[in-house]
């Protein structure tokens, strides 16, 4: 089914649910049970069940034909991802700003680069990056392979030119066999580094969350508050207009009215009014681990995020037409936060790989 067809189908489901909610004064009763003796309640249950199906997870991870999955590439990519020798000062790795302990971000309002330079935006998570067609807050990268080498070379980020990166990796004997196993040759090339890191990053997928269990039919998997929040998310609050699909994103760009001089996507589309101050819609999976929020890290909590959308943001020509005051009640706000928290899974710790040494005396060591 095409994206357009999916959106059309979803729109019909939302329209049905909105009509049902409007016809039923006690909305909470419609969602969570209680005294319900009308056909309206049954219709609401059916609409919600249909809507839950729209958020079902795909069965497999997406890997491109030009860079298919192999365990050898994942092993190599993970080592490269955690290796600080991919930075000019030998202190920064991909994992520094995209740390599994912080929802594959860094827990800071703004990223920290070479020489403790404070970057202009928050470090985006790599969770579910396998499914992205365009990356970065402003969409400047067209693939994970393209994105992988960008921060390494950037002066303000990892600060290591590609020729120096190649010389450094070739000077670490243990990397040679790893590249040969993954790509069939020891002569390390930048494209091989990019493909290995990208392959590992595609394995970083959000875990099965309470919301998924509820979607599969376990009514006790989430609270009654969260169930109400799901309906509000899809109706009155209009969150699902941009945060749809199983990843809870439309993969598009919107100006949500944050008071910032950063024009985001507008740098690449200067003549498109609605792209000024527009940033990529982030997915909401594992959201409870990923504070602070927004591209500028300006929202410390999910409660602050909900308040921002409820108020409507800064009015300007580029602001999304969807950004209007919502007039949510305190209960509706709490319900929304409760629902969003159900999108976070109970994942375990990620093991840090043993990195290749400068000599090959320990080439048989295994990962912990």
Task: Give short role names for the model-derived ranges.
Residues 2-368:
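Periplasmic c-type cytochrome electron-transfer domains
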